[in-house]
Amino acid sequence: MAEKQTAKRNRREEILQSLAQMLESSDGSQRITTAKLAASVGVSEAALYRHFPSKTRMFDSLIEFIEDSLITRINLILKDEKETLNRLRLIVLLILGFGERNPGLTRILTGHALMFEQDRLQGRINQLFERIEAQLRQVLREKKMREGEGYATDEALLASQLLAFCEGMLSRFVRSEFRYSPTADFEARWPLLAAQLQ
């Protein structure tokens, strides 16, 4: 029985990896059908539906992976790092690095892969970005408590500026068909961003 469940889990992971790879390839710029996905995995469409009731559930699983990866790592940064600017730098770098390592999933983060899918999926991505922005805002607000001095500019404005930078770099990565790395020149860009945090 355990072998059967392991095989089913492995097949599910194989389907999700195949979908992510298709999103990374030129197929990712078009609607991905279950027929194309089944052919990529090497199974029938019926076999896909034995593991996932719909393509939407496949995207849900990928979004869940994105959420878990980013939020878990952000929480680790907040636990381990105490200095505000370094916390912010590491969170921004985490988002950009995740996008760079997972180009197919970056199409989901930018909404590009969700254009032909249910609106609910885009809503989940919107909620993820709202959670990240709220986390950035909290880090900015805690500066006064941690370091004795806050920011002259509203923390909500600063948080949205940082997130807009991340979203812009991820969009540029997708638009360029993954030629322009989101982390390229980050060490030169960060001082420009940090200078705005006053």
Swiss-Prot record:
It comes from Cronobacter sakazakii (strain ATCC BAA-894). Residues 33-52 bind DNA. The lineage of its organism: Bacteria, Pseudomonadati, Pseudomonadota, Gammaproteobacteria, Enterobacterales. GO terms for cellular component: bacterial nucleoid; cytoplasm. Required for nucleoid occlusion (NO) phenomenon, which prevents Z-ring formation and cell division over the nucleoid. Acts as a DNA-associated cell division inhibitor that binds simultaneously chromosomal DNA and FtsZ, and disrupts the assembly of FtsZ polymers. SlmA-DNA-binding sequences (SBS) are dispersed on non-Ter regions of the chromosome, preventing FtsZ polymerization at these regions. The keyword Protein biosynthesis does not apply. This is Nucleoid occlusion factor SlmA. It is found in: Cytoplasm, Nucleoid. PANTHER family: HTH-TYPE TRANSCRIPTIONAL REGULATOR RUTR, NUCLEOID OCCLUSION FACTOR SLMA. GO terms for molecular function: DNA-binding transcription factor activity; transcription cis-regulatory region binding.
